[in-house]
Amino acid sequence: MTSSSPKTRKSSTKSKAKRGSKSKKAAEIKAVQRLSKTPPPFRNKVVDKKVLKNLVAWAFKHHGTAATAAMADNLKDLGFRYATQAAVSISVDDLKVPEAKQDLLGQAEELITATEECYRLGEITEVERHTKVIDTWTETNERLVDAVKKNFNQNDPLNSVWMMANSGARGNMSQVRQLVGMRGLMANPQGEIIDLPIRTNFREGLTVTEYVISSYGARKGLVDTALRTADSGYLTRRLVDVAQDVIVREEDCGTTRSILISAEDGKFGNRLVGRLTSEQVVNADQEVLAERDTPIDPQLSKKFEQSNLQGVRVRSPLTCEATRSVCRKCYGWALAHNQLVDLGEAVGIVAAQSIGEPGTQLTMRTFHTGGVSTAETGVVRSTLSGKVEFGSKARVRGYRTPHGVEAQQAEVDFNLSIVPTSGSKPQKIDIPIGSLLFVDNGQNIDIDVTVAQIASGTVQKSVEKATKDVICDLAGQVRYETIIQPREVTDRQGNITLKAQRLGRLWVLAGDVYNLPPNALPVVSGNVSVKEGQVLAEASQASEFGGEVRLRDSIGDSREVQIVTTSMILNDFKLLEESTHSGEIWHLEAQDNTRYRLNTIPGSKIGNNEVIAELSDDRFKTETGGLIKYAPGLTIKKARSAKNGYEVSKGGTLLWIPQETHEINKDISLLMIKDRQWIEAGTEVVKDIFSQTAGIVTVTQKNDILREIIVRSGTFKLCKESKALDRFEGDGQIVNPGETIAKGIKTDSMVMVQSVETPEGKGLLLRSVEEFTIPDQAQLPELKHVKQPKGPSLGIKASQRLAYKDGELIKSVEGVELLKTQLMLETFDTTPQMTVDVEVIHDLNSKGDRLKLVILESILVRRDTTSDSSHGSTHTELQIENAQVVSAGDVVATTQILCKQEGVVQLPDAVDGDPVRRLIVERDEDTITIDSKGTTLLKVGQRVVDGDFVSKDQSIDACGEIENIDGKKVKLRLGRPYMVSPDSVLHVRDGDLVQRGDGLALLVFERQKTGDIVQGLPRIEELLEARRPRDSAILCKKSGTVDIKKGDDDDSVVVSIIEDNDVISEYPILLGRNVMVRNSQQVIAGEFLTDGPVNPHELLECFFTDLRDKKPLMDAAQEAIAKLQHRMVSEVQNVYKSQGVAIDDKHIEVIVRQMTSKVRIEDAGDTTFLPGELIELRQVEDTNQAISITGGAPSEFTPVLLGITKASLNTDSFISAASFQETTRVLTEAAIEGKSDWLRGLKENVIIGRLIPAGTGFSGFVEELNAEAGPHPDILAEDPAGYRRIQNLRPDYTVDMPSSPVAKNTAVLDDPSDEDLEATRSRHGIDPTTSNFAAFARPTGDDELSAEDQMPDPAALEGLQEEGLLSDE
C-alpha cells in the first residue's frame, strides 16, 4: 500500500510522542524472533483449553520462560479484551432442552413396560428385569447426551453453556446433560443403583421424590471430599518418609540391567521421554538409531515409533545399582527443566509429592451396580436379507443373556455368512469365541436385524455370586413346573436346602390363606364348600397342673387366666408393717418374739433359693472393724460364688479381734499424732477425725498423702526378752487363758499378742479376743413344707451365713454384722415360667395379717378379633369361672377360626408328622369362567399365561391354571408365574401355602465385580502398603500344563498343574470361585488360576520359587523383584490413568524401588548377618561376593516386599524411623542394638539441625565422606557414595584380600580381637613391651612410625603362619 488511509495518518501523528517506547518494544520483539530457531507455524483452528496448553508448552520449549510469559500475558489481554466487549454468561434461556427428549423417554417407557410385562408373565427373572431396566435407562441417557450435542451444534453453536463446556473453560458434558437432558440413574446409600431414574433436568425442575433421591449422592460427595483431603495428606507423609533419603549421589552406576518399555498400539507416548537408552537401539535394517546412554527426547521417541520398534530398553531407577541412592543416568531427565538431573537432587521427595498430590483428585467411591453388565461388546446387524449359514467349524451352545433373551454362544472361532436370495455378494462376519448369536443356522432374516454380539477380546472378567429375593405378590398355593427339577442339597452343617436345577417357573395360584394358631386343628376336610362365618379350625388351651382359677382383667388383645397350683400360709408368723422415712418395712414376728425383716414386698415375685426374710438381732454385731478367725470345728459349705456370704454347715466358735481403721486420703500435714504412739479413746488423730478406742496407732502414707490410720486396742507391756519379741513378730499369735507370754507377763483371758515398737521402746501388745458361738442349726419355729404328690411344691428352709472368710481384715470404723440367719424359699418340680407370688391375707381368728406364698400357672387367652388379613375372624370362649377348681389337663378356653368369605376349602399336602399350619379357601373372585367360541385347545390342569389361545381365534387375558372344562365353558383359577434361574434356592415346596410378601426363592446370579471395586485412593493405599487382600486369587506356583478335575463335593473342582518334570501340584478351588484357566492350557508361575484380587507377597514368592530352580540365587531374586516391580508400577499407573491423572513412571519407580530393596536372610552362612534380618539386596550381594572369594558359605535369602509404612520403619536411620511412627519401640530397639545413625537422609539431618545433604549441601556431604574414609580412600574408590556398611568395617583395620589362585584355600584374615592377639603373643613368647610391631599393632592415624619400626618381626610372622592367619607368601 502506497498511500496511507486517513485513519492511519491520524494515528501516526498521535504516536510520534510514543516512538521511543515503541522502538523499545520492537527491539524486544526482534530479540524474541532472533531466539526462535523455527518460525511459529500458522494454526488455523478453534483454540480450546487443550490447544492452548500445547501452544504454551511449545512456546516454553522453543523460546524459554521470558518469551512464554510475554505470550501468555498477551493471550490473557486478548481474552479479557473480547470478554469485555461481549461477555459469556448463563441465563435460564440458554438452557435449551432438545425436542427429541420426549420421544426418547417415550421409547424407554415402552421398552420398560414391555420388560415389566415379560416379568409378569414369568418369562424373565427378577434379576433380568432389573438389569434390563437399568440398561435401558443408561442407553437412553447416552442417546439423550447425543441429542443435546446435536441440538446445540445445529441450532445454537454459540450458546454460552455449550461454549463453556466445549472449550474446557468450565463444566463438562455430564453437567450439561443434567442441566438440559435428564439427571439419570442415582445410587442409594448402599451404592446400589435405584431403578427409578430422575427423568427431569434442572431446567425443568425436580419433583420432591426426585430431589430426595438425588440428595443421597450429593451428601456422599461432600463427606468424601473431606475424608479424601485427610487420607491424601497422610499418604503423602508416608511416601515422603519412605523415599526422603533417595538423592542423586552418583554420575553413573555402570549397570547393564534395564527395563523394557513396550509400545502400545505402535505408540510410546510420553513414556520414553526423559529416559536414557541402556543399549544401542537399531531398527529392522540394523541402522543405529541411538547409542547407549542417549537421552530420549520427543523427536527420538517419534523416530522409534516410525521405525516400528516394539520395545526399547531404557535405564530406570528400578535397576540402578547405586547403593541407597540413584545415579544421574538411571534417573534421566529432571522433569522440571527437561535436562539430565543434577547431583544432589532429592528425587525421592519429588517422587513422593508427585504421587501424593493428585490424591485429592481421586475418587473414593465404591459402586454396586446391582448386576449391570458393562461388557464392551459390539453389535453386528445384517446389511442384507438372506439365509444365515454357520461355517463348518461352528460349535455353539444355548445361552441366556443377562436380559433374559435366549441366544447361542460360540464355543470356537468361526465365520458366519448371510447368503442373499438375489445372488449378490454374501455378508461375512467373523465370530470370535464367546460371542452371542441371535439367529439360528439356516434361518431367513431381513435387513438390519441384530445377528450377533461380538465379544471384545478374551478378557476374562472376574465375576462374583450375588443373590436377589423373589417376593410373592399374592396369597395362594405354590405349584412347581416339572422342568425345574428341584433337588435337595445338604451343606457341611447338615442343613438341607432345595435348589432348582433348570430354568423354570414357580406358580402361585390365588386363594385366601388362613394362618392357624400354634395348637389349632382344622375341623373341615379338603374340597368342601364353606359359608361365611363357618368354623374352619379350633384351638384349645388346657391347664398343665390344675388348681384354683383366678380371672384377671384383660390387657391389650389378650386376657390372663391364673391357676393357683400350690399355696402356703406362714401361720406361725405375724406380718407387721412399719413406716419409716425411706418407705414401708415389713417384719415377720414369731411366737417367741424374734423378728425377721422381710426382703420382699407383698405383691412381688420370688424364685427358688431366694431369701424371703432375715433375722434381726444384734448378737453378732461388733462395735468396730477388725480381724475375723474361725476356731477349729467351724466349717462352711463350698459355694461357687461368695456374693451372698458363706453358708455354715457345722457350728462352732468365731474369734473376733477388734481394730479401728480410718480410711483417709488427705495431706500428711493434717496428722495430729505420731506413728506407733499409744493414744486414748477420743483422741483427735487427724483434723476432725477422732479415735473411738484406746490403743496403738499405725499410720500408712504414700507420697505425703495419708492413706490409713489403724488403732489396735489392748494393753501394751514393755518387754526386753528377745525370744518373746521374735515369737510374736508379724501378724502375732492367739494365746489361751493362763498361758505365760513372757517373763512376768501372764493372761487371764484369750488374747492376741503382737510385738510392736513404740517411741517408748519395744514391747508386746495384748489385744482382747471376743468369742461368738454359732449353733449347728438356726433356731427357727417349725416350718411346714407343702408337698404335692404330682406337680410343683414349695417350702421354707433356714440358713446361717457368715459375711467374711477366715483371716479377713474388715477395715471399718463402724461395727459390722458377722452372721446372718436367713429364711429361704425352696421349690420343687416347677417349670421355668412358674413364679412364686408373695401375698398378704387377713387371718380372721387372730385378727392379724399372715404371709401367703403362691405358685401360679399363667395362661394367656386370645380375645375375639373381627376379620384379620391372615388369621381370619376368631372367636374365643372361656370354659371356666372364677374360683373354680380345675384338674390337670382340663380345657380353659377354646378359640375358633371363622371363614371370612364363602368358597371351597383346600388343605395343603401333609408333610410327615408336621401339623397343618395354614389352610386356603378358593373364593369366587379367585377364578374366572371363559366362554370358548370354538373348539378349546386347552386341557384341565394346563397352566396358561396372558396371550395364550383358548380356541383358534380367541386369546386369554389372564394367567392361571385350567380347573374345569364344561362344554364351551372353561374355568380358570387365577395365578401368577415367577421365573427362577438354575441353582436358585427355593424357600417353598410344591403345594405350600404362601401369604402375600413371603419369600418364594433366592435367585443366585453372577455379576461382574464392579461392585466395591476399590478405586482411587484406597486402591493406591492398598498397593503401596502391599496389603494382603481378603479372598485373594489362587496363583500358580510353578509353570506347567493345566488339568481340571471334579472335587469331592458336587460343586468344587481341583486344578492340577503338571510340570515339565511330571511333578503334579494340586490346587483345590472352593465353591464360588471362578476358574480362570482351561484344560491343557500352558500356564506360567504367578498366573491366576481363579479370579480375585492378587496378593503381591504371594506373587513375589511364586516368581522367586519358580526362578530359583532355573537360575542362581542372586539372579532369581533380581528377576523376581523386577517382575513384581513392573506389575506394581503398572497397577498404580492404572488407578491414576483411570482418573485422568498423568504421573511419570519414574516417580512411581523410585517408591517401588524402596519397597523392594530389602531381602530376608534365611541362612546366614559364614556372613555376619542374622537369620530373619532384613538387609539391602546390594549389601547382601557385596558380602556374598567377598565371602565366595575366600571360599566361605554365602548367605541364603528370599526377596521381600515391604509396604511404605513398614519400609519407613525399617530404614537404616533410626532417627528418621522414630520420627515417623512407634517412636518408643524404634528408639528402644536402636538403643539395645547399639545402632549408629549415619545421617544420610534429609529427615535425620533436619531433625538434629544440620545442613541437608541435598542441593547445595551435597558438596559438603561428599567432603565429609572423604574425611570419614580417612586413610582408606579405597573405600570410596569402589563405593563412591560412601555407603559401605561401616558398622561391619572397623575404620582402623583393613584387610587386602589375597588375589592369587594359590590363595583360594587360604583362610580369611578376619579382624582379630585384642584377646586373640594377646593369646598369639603369649603362645610364641613375644614380649609386647619390647616388640611394638606392625603385625600386632593397629595403625592409629597419628602414630608416626619409622620405616624400620614398620618392618614386621620375623618371629611374629612365623607365629602368624603357624596359627594359619597368614599365607606362606
UniProtKB/Swiss-Prot annotation:
What HAMAP family is this protein classified in? RNApol_bact_RpoC2 (MF_01324)
Task: Supply the source organism for this entry.
Answer: Prochlorococcus marinus (strain NATL1A)
Tell me the protein's name: DNA-directed RNA polymerase subunit beta'
A Pfam family it matches: RNA_pol_Rpb1_5
Reaction(s) catalysed by this chain's protein: RNA(n) + a ribonucleoside 5'-triphosphate = RNA(n+1) + diphosphate
Biased region (Low complexity) positions are 1357-1369
**What are the coiled-coil residue ranges?**
none
Which terms does the UniProt entry file under GO BP? DNA-templated transcription
Residues reported to bind Zn(2+): C253, C320, C327, C330
Q: Where is the composition biased (Basic residues)?
A: 7-24
What does this protein's UniProt record list under function?
DNA-dependent RNA polymerase catalyzes the transcription of DNA into RNA using the four ribonucleoside triphosphates as substrates.
